[in-house]
Amino acid sequence: MRTDLFDFHLPPENIALRPASPREAARMLVVQGDGVLRDRTIGDLPDWLEPGDQLVVNDTKVIAAQLSGRRISRETEAKIEATLIKRLDGSRWQALVRPAKKLLAGDTIRFGNEGKVCLLGHLDATVEAKGEEGEVTLSFVFHGPALDQAIADLGRPPLPPYIAGKRPADEQDAQDYQTMFAAKEGAVAAPTAGLHFTPALEQRLRARGVGLQRVTLHVGAGTFLPVKVEDTEGHRMHAEWGSLTPETAAALNQAKAEGGRIVAVGTTSMRLLESAALPDGTIAPFEAETSIFITPGYRFRAVDILMTNFHLPRSTLFMLVSAFAGLETMQAAYAHAIESGYRFYSYGDACLLFRQPDERVVEP
């Protein structure tokens, strides 16, 4: 499909720089496909679900992936900003660096600017390799848990570029940019639909008879990238590691068999569920990387309802929601949201989408 079909203009004032407070006060646009767009709030979510439905949340935890440092391996130093984007092994990470032109393979970076130190001393990394678009492979002096602790001590929350370009990350972001379900470290971006949940909302959902299941998908920086090719056929999707346990698969399959609906909280949960689903709709255990790319024409196997934030133009995520609820439906929904002052992106409002009827069998 042509990429420009997924383009739209978003006024800068619609981009949220802070989350709603309290979190349940964020707005929620309900899109059922009947032509009626309903303006609600996150606090209304239990009213749209039925006993036996299963919410599926992503329990990944965002690491402090933004690091400041300096190149120390030459006669003159140079300031370096690095964003960790993918763990390669116990001591190596793939990272995006700025300015990339200041680094060569073999250079050493010492992280810990702005008065920050880690308990084990300074954190050095060697540039093992350098890619064409600013990505580098960093080999750190620490390994495993020691490296994780050093990154936590020295790093900052890796805010998305549309927020970081307007203001620096602060201590409040360390709380705001983490869901209440966060348990397993590895993400460099938050599964943002989960940011809307509070213990009180979870209690109301359980009282309604709605189940809650956890999966893990470590969100990568590629989630923010626009599709740059003119046709979606030419886009190469980024890979992210995910896990869905046998116990969770069994609980979801039992709920489906009893008439319950699968409600994905966020596109990350959606992508993992669809990656784990078999052709007959059975959800299988899963532990691997997925690079599933969902565009209109895809036949959904697992998910019935999707709760998600509002996404970037030309992004793979806007393509995903258009596949789920219909392109024309989502174009109308986004136009309504923009006109009505909904807040977009990571700290913004949400929409609740019901899957469009589609009997076509189209493999991903």
Swiss-Prot record:
Its EC number is 2.4.99.17. Its main location: cytoplasm. Transfers and isomerizes the ribose moiety from AdoMet to the 7-aminomethyl group of 7-deazaguanine (preQ1-tRNA) to give epoxyqueuosine (oQ-tRNA). Pathway: tRNA modification; tRNA-queuosine biosynthesis. It catalyses: 7-aminomethyl-7-carbaguanosine(34) in tRNA + S-adenosyl-L-methionine = epoxyqueuosine(34) in tRNA + adenine + L-methionine + 2 H(+). This is S-adenosylmethionine:tRNA ribosyltransferase-isomerase. InterPro entries: QueA, QueA_dom1, QueA_dom2, QueA_sf. It comes from the Bacteria. One of its GO terms (cellular component) is cytoplasm. It comes from Bradyrhizobium sp. (strain ORS 278). The gene is queA. Monomer. Keywords: Cytoplasm, Queuosine biosynthesis, S-adenosyl-L-methionine, Transferase. One of its GO terms (biological process) is tRNA wobble guanine modification. PANTHER family: S-ADENOSYLMETHIONINE:TRNA RIBOSYLTRANSFERASE-ISOMERASE. Belongs to the QueA family. It is found in: Cytoplasm. One of its GO terms (molecular function) is S-adenosylmethionine:tRNA ribosyltransferase-isomerase activity. Gene3D superfamilies: QueA-like.
